[in-house]
């Protein structure tokens, strides 16, 4: 594990400060400095290259003993290219140049944003030359650590409000992709309910029905993945050294229906995947980290950007933001990442931004480069990693027995149904709520991609799987889950499971096919208990006081309740009036629970009304605890109150590393209990090397946490 920082992005900081600042960075213990190499700046003419500043940076960083993370930015093409090759520019869906481009954006103040359409031959050729020339120049540098081949996947699949470029090359690729997918135009016509004479007639229309919209989303993702493979191929050919890592990262927003990237498809050829983070809610941050870790598919992942100072609130005037990071938060966000298995955390940035709409934000130092309490906190973090390298170099997090299922096409449908019509996205709320609930009681949560589950089954280590939004089916998915349940897994389904078949057509009976066999229920009606009460969005499902749900009382829910007819042997668990809306079926050695209401969504809705804080006594937590017990799952460590924790293991030692997080704005006290200690063990605070006390069988330990702070505890000598 290591900590680094962004340092130079033209024009900040000024050259005369570099030697002083880089020495400062080395003295506080940071290991890696990020350098941006913007295309628009380093190639001012067709055969002109200006690398003097970058050369100097590499020299001074090497003198300071610092490694360099070099950021390639093909998203800012030089202005002479736009003037000479207008055919390479982005276009709207009518084929016209997008107004007011290229421009200087917040993150690319040198201009040239958003770059070129790399579906165009000339755009691709010019960008390849930029990458080859730049990479070849620095591949022999001893202190080159990694190339970031794509910053935050900008411009993603949307730029300036457009789904993708409307140039002839992109539209042609869209039509070729459809032909490869369908083979014959009549096959597409049958599915889309159209009457095209050929694939050449097919336009791109962003507001359309589910089936076409899913194809558009999957083409967008295919195109994004192809662009990533293209970039990686160019960079690796120019720098074949395997110790020079190729990395990339997504942007700092939370996952919602506007999050259009299927991260699992862009990580295949990277050495490390990462994410920025500019969220305040620790639980949202945790969800983004679990997302990033899971999408990395076992590869290293990084917290690639985290604010070192004042943040942004996405308002017009960023400098008015009141989101200034405390010293505690400066430690906590990287420690949150490390507690989710990250191998690196990179501050954005060492010096406050000096130019453009992102100024004067983000610095670990003040605007003059002087140290602050945040630089001291970053130094404490780096020093802890150095002092306890034997612990952190051997830290690992066992695969989680608890997972959420993610079906990208379901959330594409939700994007069309809700977000684009200004409605609350219920599937996203349900996913977020289940994640918040599980995280609050100490579970690590894996995210399983539905395509992986359909193709390869559920990993053996998963014992409890929740599908928060199963509105659309996928071939093989129900069969994979059914086999896993028969083998002893516990599965929780969402309302309207399989409401649409894999083609996007509504199923005549819900749930259909294998889903029906697995869950043992049939939808009889959709109920909307709050439809006539505009003052409330939450209703209650009464739980049947037997077995699994005995003593819990009721569960808050949102939006709708799915009434069921039950097959023989299926046990009712929850009701709304006379209608059964929640059931349990035993299948082989496992259990399948049909939840006909969005319980996770209500949990998330209520937590957001409490500034993100879950209620420790919420009935959903009681239900999840019982489901986990049936699945044979429990966290290694639990914490009381509003603290939540993540626990890792130290290879070959029997020691545990506990990351204890306080997401609240107040100082709190929590009691920690370790579930699997055979004897009493000492507990040490690794940040200050103090002995906190002893914990063991039947013996909990009281720990204090400052507001928004994290403590790192070593359990065991």
At which residue positions do the language-model features occur?
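A short, well-structured beta->alpha microelement
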Residues: 253-258, 436-457
